[in-house]
C-alpha cells in the first residue's frame, strides 16, 4: 500500500512537471506576425469619417523591412505618388510624403499590429500623430487607426 502511494505521488509529480514544461515551451515559442504585403485599395465608404479620392497602397513586407508605395488620385487632377521605407525595429526613417511634406517615422510591433509614431513637418509646423495598422476580417482588410490631437480617424483598405 505504501509503495502504491509513492508510485501515485511520483506519477503526479512527473505529470505536473511535464505540464509545466510544455506551458513554458508554448510561452517561449516565437509569435508569428501578420504579413502586410499586397495591393490595398482605400474603402472610402467604410472610413470614419468617409473619404474621397482613389488611394492605393502597394506594400512589400519582409519583417523587419517594410516598404509602402502610395498612389493618390482625385478625379482628373494630377495624381500623387510616394514610396516610404521603414523597419519595424523602432529606428526613425525620414521620407517625403505624397503631399511633399517631410515625415520622421518609427515603427514597432504591438502584439499583431504595427504602431507608427509620426512627426510630420508641414509649412513650418511639426504635427505629431500615431497610427496603428492591423489586418482584420481574415486578412481581407487593412485597418489604419490614426490618432491626432484633433481626433481619431479610421481608414480601411480592402485587399485587391
Features from the language model and the residues they span:
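Bacterial N-terminal signal peptides that target proteins for export
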Residues: 3-18
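Basic/polar N-terminal segments that are highly enriched at the extreme N-terminus
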Residues: 2-5, 29-31
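Hydrophobic small-molecule pocket/channel-lining residues, especially in calycin-type beta-barrels
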Residues: 29-160
Amino acid at each position: 500500500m505504501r509503495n502504491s502511494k509513492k508510485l501515485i505521488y511520483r506519477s503526479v509529480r512527473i505529470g505536473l512537471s511535464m505540464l509545466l514544461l510544455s506551458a513554458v515551451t508554448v510561452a517561449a515559442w516565437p509569435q508569428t506576425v501578420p504579413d502586410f504585403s499586397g495591393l490595398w485599395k482605400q474603402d472610402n465608404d467604410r472610413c470614419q469619417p468617409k473619404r474621397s479620392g482613389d488611394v492605393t497602397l502597394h506594400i512589400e513586407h519582409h519583417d523587419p523591412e517594410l516598404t509602402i508605395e502610395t498612389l493618390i488620385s482625385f478625379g482628373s487632377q494630377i495624381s500623387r505618388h510616394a514610396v516610404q521605407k521603414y523597419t519595424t525595429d523602432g529606428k526613425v526613417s525620414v521620407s517625403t510624403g505624397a503631399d511633399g511634406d517631410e515625415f520622421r517615422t518609427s515603427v514597432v510591433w504591438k502584439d499583431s499590429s504595427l504602431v507608427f509614431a509620426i512627426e510630420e513637418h508641414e509649412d513650418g509646423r511639426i504635427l505629431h500623430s500615431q497610427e496603428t495598422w492591423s489586418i482584420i476580417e481574415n486578412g481581407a482588410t487593412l485597418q489604419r487607426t490614426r490618432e491626432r490631437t484633433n481626433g481619431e480617424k479610421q481608414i480601411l483598405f480592402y485587399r485587391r
